[in-house]
């Protein structure tokens, strides 16, 4: 299972939030 938090680390919080709105696994720990 990929580590999304590490994968999206370089991205901005806005982009992370936008990506989180798409269909990602519930395990995705996004900072909201």
Swiss-Prot record:
GO BP, sorted A to Z: proteolysis
Keywords from the UniProt entry: Hydrolase, Protease, Thiol protease, Zymogen
Enzyme class: hydrolase
Superkingdom: Eukaryota
Molecular function, one GO term: cysteine-type peptidase activity
Entry's EC annotation: 3.4.22.-
Transmembrane region(s): none
Propeptide residues, chain positions: 1-22
Function summary: Thiol protease.
Family to which this protein belongs: Belongs to the peptidase C1 family.
Designated name of the protein: Cathepsin B-like cysteine proteinase
The organism's taxonomic lineage, starting at the top: Eukaryota, Metazoa, Spiralia, Lophotrochozoa, Platyhelminthes
């Amino acid at each position: 299972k990929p580590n999304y938090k590490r994968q999206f680390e370089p991205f901005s919080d806005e982009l992370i939030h936008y990506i989180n709105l798409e269909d990602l696994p519930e395990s995705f720990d996004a900072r909201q």
